Amino acid sequence: MRKRIFAILLLTGWVTTTLVGQEQATRKDSDRWQQYANYYMEIDMNVETNRFQGVQKLEYTNNSPDELNQVFYHLYFNAFQPESMMDVRSRSIQDPDRRVGDRISKLSNEEIGYQKIFSLKQDGEQVEFEVVGTVLEAKLNEPIQPGETVTFDMEFEGQVPLQIRRSGRDNREGIRYTMTQWYPKLAEYDYQGWHADEYIGREFYGVWGDYEIKISIDEEYVIGGTGYLQNPLEIGHGYENPGQTVKKKVENGKLTWHFVAPNVHDFAWAADPDYAHDKLTMDNGMVLHFFHQKGQNEENWKALMPLAERAFEYANENFGQYPYKQFSVIQGGDGGMEYPMSTMITGNRGSLLGVTIHEALHDWYHGVLGNNEALTPWMDEGFTSYASGRISRHLRSDGSEETTIENIGTPAGGSYLRIATSDIEEPLSTHSDHYNLNGAYSTAAYGKGAVWMSQLGYVIGEEARDKGLLEYFNTWKFKHPNPNDVLRVFERVSGLELDWYNEYFVYTTKNIDYGVQNVVGEGKQTNVTLEKIGLMPMPVDVVVTYKDGTKEVHYMALRMMRGEKPAETNDPRVVHPDWPWTNPTYEFSID
C-alpha cells in the first residue's frame, strides 16, 4: 500500500504551481473568396542616384460580391521622410525602436525614400488619384463588378531610402540594396472591406497573385529574393547548374534579371556586388539559396546550410508541406524580416541560425496562410515563434545543432510572464499599430502568441493540437484566416468547445492563476480544495506524487469545454465533474 505522503502538482496550462501537501478536402467554412492581383513590372535601377524607374501592369480580379468604386495602393517608401507618420510616431512613443529613433527626421533629400506616381490607367483610361502619406487613393472611372477583371497600368519612380527600418540602401553591414516594400502595392480588400493602412512601421497584409518582375541593374550586382529566376544562363552569379555555360546578356553595362513568383502576396529582393551565392538542393528537389557577403562569417554561413535543410524537413512533416520550389536566406535589412520565399537577415550576428529558422517558419504563417498581420500579428509572429522553438528543440535532440552557431533562445513565454504581471499588457486583439508601447506589442505578438499555441496543447491535448496544426495549414492556406477560423479547426479536431479560450486569452488581459487552498486528511481520505485566483478559467490537472514515486492524475475540465481531453500519460487518471467558471473553489478527494 502506498504511503499517504505525497506532493500535489497543480497544472493549469502555461502557468504551473507546485505545492507540497498537400491538399486536403476544403471545408465549406473555408470557401472564402479571395481577391487576386497579377503583377508585371519592369524596373531600371540607377546605382549612382539610388533611384529606379518602373512600369507596372496589374490585372485585378474582383472575386468579392461587392462593386468596387475605388482602389488603394501602398507607397511604403514615402514613410522615410521627415514628418511622416512613421517619423512622428517613432519620436513620440515612449519606447522607440532604437533602429529608427529620430533618424527619419534627419534624412536629407538624397537620403529619403519616395515613390512618385506619374500615371495610373484603368483599362487604358487615365484615373484620378491622390497620394496621402503612404497611401494612394484612386477613384475609378468605372466600378469593378463582382467577378470582373480589370487592368491597371502605372508609371512610377522610386528613390531607395538610407536603410533605417527593413528596406533601404547601404545598411550597417554594407549591403547596397534591401528592396522590400519597394513598389506600389495594391491594398487588400476582403470580407471586412479595404485595408489601406498607413505604414507606421509594423505589419503587412497583401493580395494573392502571380508576379513577373524584370530588374535591370549593373552587371556586377548579384540579386536574391522572391521568385524563380527565368534566365539563369544569361545571368550566372551562381544560378547556373554545374556544367552549364553562361553567356551573359549585358546591355549598357547592365543585366536584366527575370523572375516569376506564383501565388504570393509580396515580392522582395536584395542586391549587392559582393554577395557570395551558395545553394543546397534538398532530397525533395527544393533548393535553398544563401546570399551573404564574401569573406565575412563564412564558417557560420556554411554551417547554417545543412541545419536549414533539417529545419525545412521538420516543418514539412509537422506544420504542412512548403508549397514553393525554393527559399532564399539573404544578408540584408536591419535584423530579420520575412517575405514570400525569402528572408532578409543581418549576417554579423551570433543568432544566425535562430533568426533564420524563425524567419523561414514565417513562410508557413505569414507567407502561405497570410492572416492580416496588422489586425492579428500574434497569429503570425506567435505561431512562428512556437514552431521555430519546436524546431530548435528538435535540432538539439537529434544532435544536428552542434555548431558554432548559437542554440536559439529561451521560450517566448518568458517575455509574456513578465508583461502579464505588469500594468502595460494590452489585449492580443489590439491593432499592431496602436499598442501604447513597442515592448507591449512585441511581447504580445511574439510571446503571448506563442503561449496561445503551446497552452492550447494543455487544453485539448498535445496530440490534438499537433493534428490541428496540420489541418489548419491544409484548410486555410492561401485564404487569409482569422482568429475564429483557427479556433474552429482545433474545435473540430478535439471535439471540445473553445470559444471561451479566445474570449479570455485574446480579447482580455485576464490572467491564469490557480492555487491549492487547503489539504485535509480525514481517515483514509484526503480532501483537496483548489481556488481560482486569476480571472481566466482553465481546465486543471492535479498530479499527485506519492512517497514511493508513483503518480496519479486528477482532472477537472471546464464546463464550458463540453467535454474532456484524453489522458496523455500512463499514470492512473481520475476524471472529476467539470468546474463551472463561476465557482471560485473546487473540492475533490483522494482515496
Give the positions of each predicted feature.
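N-terminal, polar/Ser/Thr-rich
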Residues: G21-Q53, E173, L498-W500, Y504
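Hydrophobic helix-coil surface modules that form long, contiguous segments used
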Residues: L186-G193, G201-I357, Y386, D398
